[in-house]
Amino acid sequence: MKENIKVSTAVSWTWLSILVVVMVSTNLRSPITAVGPVLGQISEDLQLNSFQSSLLTAIPLFMFASCSVAVSRYSHKLGMHRFLLFGLMLLSVGIVLRVWGNMPTLFVGSFLIGLGICVGNVVTPGYIKTSFPKQIGLMTGIFAVAMNLTAAFASGFSLRLGEWTGLGWQGSLGVWVILALLSLIVVFFDGLGRKKAPGITENRQATSGIGYIFRSRLAWYISLFMGIQSLIYYSLISWLPNVLVDYGMPKEDTGWLLFLIQIAMIPIMFIGPILAHRMKDQRLMATAVAIGMLGSIFIFWHYKLQGIYVAAVLLGLSNGLSFSLSILFFTLRARSTANAIKISGMAQSVGYFIAAFGPPVFGRLHEIDATWNYSFYFLAGSIVLLLFAGWKAGEATYVAED
């Protein structure tokens, strides 16, 4: 009888752990992807120039870069649930401040949003490795799909949400606080249940420092792969609506093209990690990512609105696979949960530092060349570096532990 109760309790908390992964992941992109379609409204309302506008996307990325190492160092010592709760609280406050209606709170809110998302970015891969050690590929796929499905809706419905709420861009961006608060409740009950339920523990332990990770060549390749694929993603999420408007697309249709890109990412983000987990190494997948990205960038640049939907789907597939590979590398290249979190911390710190330069550089190159040619050359060169880093990170080996 007692054994049946233990089994039933363990199954219940397994489902709750799945819900934690899903709910946390839904908050890790949507507050950022919702910005692109309403960026023009924000700039007009608050009188922002091009550089200030690009900071709305760049600030969260700089926060990912500056805080990921600290989060990875202390989360395993102090508890993943505490950090997730703290991150969701920061995210909720940041969303509210960002839509307050003036420039200072706009940027302070963006700062807090970046810090809150940083916690989820770093800790969730470790949570997956701890809670689902035998289903890493599957749970990474679920994590990536949930993240990008909500990101797709955030970009596709951003303008509509502003119209439906009657609050304009403030409604478009503010509505996401509801999801953050619901996620906070789920994480709270999961942590509470692990304290009370028999046999359900968080596996908290003291770990060595993170410095040795930065001496690993493999960890640097993983970080570069993470950074360059994020740079490409955030550059296009931020500026593609403006590019398409210059090409002649109606402004109201640009959000739907971003929606199509995000939707195209979803199938490959679910299937990709499962297949990659079963492969001897992931170098072939890294090559496929680079080919797909180069193809989509070429169509956007050369054919403009002709073949635009083919380019969008191709970009979604290649970007979806590149992101899932990045997250999967954190766990596949680590022998322990502690090491997975440290690799995640380094990769996201270095990676998002690289990515944060994407939107400002892409926008600055457009100021130099109004045809967007220089901006697309910048992305093409980045993809070549992505292929090199992916080929190295895809080798079947481990980051050595201290």
List the model feature ranges, each with a label.
Residues 2-11, 192-222:
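Juxtamembrane intracellular "pre-TM" segments in multi-pass secondary transporters
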Residues 35-36, 217-259, 263-269:
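Extracytoplasmic gate region of multi-pass secondary transporters
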Residues 66-104:
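Conserved MFS/SLC helix-loop-helix module at the cytosolic interface between two early adjacent transmembrane helices
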Residues 67-79, 268-281:
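Helix-to-loop junctions at the C-terminal end of transmembrane segments
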Residues 103, 134-192, 239:
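Helix-loop-helix hairpin linking two adjacent transmembrane segments in secondary transporters
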Residues 109-145:
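Cytoplasmic helix-loop-helix junction between adjacent transmembrane helices
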Residues 119-132, 321-335:
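Intracellular juxtamembrane helix-capping segments at the cytosolic ends
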Residues 334-372, 378-379:
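A late C-terminal transmembrane helix in Major Facilitator Superfamily
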